[in-house]
Each structure stands twice: as C-alpha cells, then as structure tokens.
Amino acid sequence: MATSARIDDLKGAAQSFAHLAQGHRPEGHNPIYGRLHNDTVAAFEEAMMSVEGGDDAVAFGSGMAAMTALLFAATQHGDHVVALRPLYGGSDHLLSDGLTGLKVKWVEAHEVAAAVNEDTALVLAETPANPTLDLVDIQSLAMAAGDVPVVIDNTFATPVLQNPLELGATMVLHSATKYIGGHGDVIGGVVVGDEEWMKQVRQIRIGTGGLLHPMAAYLLRRGLGTLPVRMEAAQTTARRLAIRLVEHEAVERVHFPEFPACDPKGLVGTQMRGPGAMVAIDVGDADKASQVMESVQLMTPAVSLGSTDTLIQHPALLTHQLMDEEAKEDAGVSLGLLRISVGLEAVEDLWNDLDQALSAR
C-alpha cells in the first residue's frame, strides 16, 4: 500500500520511469510510484486478462474513468466515432456533450457498415444494452466495422456469459463496480485488449491519474472468485421473474435477453452462455413507474446493478436523464421503463414484493 518505492539506483530508476511512462508493466523495473504501478492492481488486471481472453488489461478508479481513457487512447480530437444506442447513460453523455471533441454518429447495428468511413476511429456498443437489454451480434458488428477498432461494454454479461474478444472485438470494457465487485461496496473499471492497445490505455491512465485504489483492486479480485456462482443464481431467479412478469396485468412489456424481442437473432446460447440477471419492465408511464419504485419493500430503489441485493431504478429520470428526449425515445428509454438488477434473494420473496408494488393503487 506504499505510495513510493525505495530508489537505491538513480540511473536504474530513471530507466524504470521511462519504461513505465510508455505504458509497460514494470517487468523487473522499479515501480517508482503508485500512480505508475501497483502490484495489487496488477493482480486484478491479470485476472481480468485471463477471464476475458486478452493479452493485457488496465484497471481504473471507475467505469467512466476506463471509458474516458479508452476514448483518449483510441481517438483524436475531431475523429469520427460510430456508436450504438442505448448505452449506459454516463457513456452516452460523455460522447454527446462535446467534451471529447468527437464527431459521433448514432446508429443501429444494421447501419454500422454504411456509417463507417475513412475518418472513423472507433465503433462502440454495449450488449446486452443498458437499459433495454437488446442484444448486438458482436461478430457481425466486427465484420461491419472492417479495420475500425470495435469496443464492447461487457458489464451486463460479464466474462462468465460472454467474451467479446473471441468474437472479433478489439477491446472490452467493464464497469467493475457492478457484477465483478458484486456486493455494492467498491467502484472500479477495467479495459481488456491486446498489448499494444493496452500500452496506449495505460499511458492515458498514468497521465490522468485514474488508477484503481489497491484496496478496491483487492475487493474486485476477490469478487471475481464468486462471480460464476453469483451470476448463475441471479440469472435463474431473473428468468423466473421475467416469465411471471409477462403475465402481470400492470406490465405492458418485459425486456429480458432470452425473449425474442430482445434477441431476434438467437444470440443467447451462441454468443452468450445465458441471458444474465437483468430484467426491465415497462409499466406505461412515469407516474406508475414512480409508484412501483416507491412501493417496493424488499428490493432497494437505487441506481447501479450487479449486487447481491436486488435493485430497481428508473433510467429515464436517473441513469439516462442527461440524454435528450429524442435520443431517449430512439433508444427505447421510455418514462414507463424500470430496470431491475436481480440479486440473490429468494425468488418468491422478490415476486411477492414486485407483485404488491405493481398492484398498489
């Protein structure tokens, strides 16, 4: 946990500093300073590299720090980026508010090939998408992008259910805060890819200071050990809830990756090894959504996801609030939409809670 490493050889330390500043791991060099390298953070990165099938990984203090560094590493001011909606609201806002200086073209998956041009630096997608849970065919997306790097936000699926690098993606992004941490008590992000890309991403982390705290890295590495068990249990419960919610009179539509409306190409079972543990429901309007969210007793009305506790939130007014109304409509982020991150509580307890909240007058 020390911030600095002892320097007994100044010339060697100078060489180490230059080595690290170029985005390399220490590899026998003095780590110099905690912003340049930390062994605990590196252990988490190595674990993520292994589970995602990449050559290297770079961890950050948050998912948005990871997204920002990735964009800085892969693009220059004025570059063209093709992005698929919906994305996490924070990512959407970063791409839309002009801060990055990028020219962003928002498209649907089938429009990517036509949208890519000689100035396109990056294609970006999230699958399952946040918050509608629509699936994107990663292999087809990579083919449509051609030589343009493809970044996939794999937060909802996790490495347990989906490995985008094996399907042609260039880099994979995670908000490690969510399923990887798994207990709602740590914030972090990580990017996985090949060595050359990760050297560039690591250089941005060094320059901007977005390093993951060692204690957070420890918690995230620990969370990876239970991720398969947690995901399997939560997914089983989510499936049972989704099936029952289809029949509830207060629910107009259920979004769940295993349902054809979210997965018309049959990607669950091929691209994904399971549907995951997220469910979204449309209850018609903001008033009803507010009533449901404020009526739950076992579930926690809160943003974030992937915890052992079941969380319910209203994307249009919370996580995706900063999107303009037209963009929300195009992305399917309606005022009646509620996103549910299913946790590890007993399925009947969760159903009873949802049923009473949906039936409240």
Where are these regions (language model features)?
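Conserved small-domain helix->loop->beta segment predominantly found in fold-type I
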Residues: 239-303, 323-329
